[in-house]
Amino acid sequence: GSTRKNTRKEKAAVACDAGTLAEVKEKYRQERLERVQKLSPKNEHQSETIEAFKDKQLIIQSGSAGVGKTELACWWASKLWLEGKIDTIVITRPHKHLGDDYGAVKGSDAEKLLPFCMSILMKLRKHLGVGTLRNNFKMDRLDDLFGDAKGIVIVPIEKIQGLSYDSRTIIIGDEIQSASVSQVKALATRMEEGCQLLLCGDKLQSAISGINGLEYLEQVLVKHPH
């Protein structure tokens, strides 16, 4: 008899009416929105970049180190995440300039790139919060990860082709001046599925001889502005 009573009590506790559930969801949404950090542009270029974030699918930030390229990209991605508009942030970059020792480093591709993505991850931690980054950062094998899994992930630009990203995904591409033309073409085609692509690079720091991916994309956008 007591077992049945306990079972009924447990069911009653689990059964929560739709109104209460909606209130909980709304409270959680408001808490996330309150964590969105305001970012004041430091100059006209940053103001233009932030405006471009709002209605452009592909945004290229080109300039020397220290001008705030990745800071802006990470702030925007974090803002959309906390607003509930995206549920996947992909961090990608080439390993062209990392040297011949890259292949000898133990671990998965994501684990090999992790030390070189720390700057972006630190900025995401700043804008998302430690808990959100810890709970959503994925370091699983790529074959297992890129099914229906969501979260914050690292993937080498060399492996981006063939992976699918929808409109609830933002891709942050760093050091794109060291990507080849074919690699950025593969990256750009991800936009066909609806995701937003934020690319950062410095043309003066390229490890590519001849035209690099960053220069190629800039030339394309001059001819065919979107």
What spans do the regions from the language model cover?
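Conserved helicase motor core of SF1/SF2 NTP-dependent helicases
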Residues: 3, 8-20, 26, 30, ...
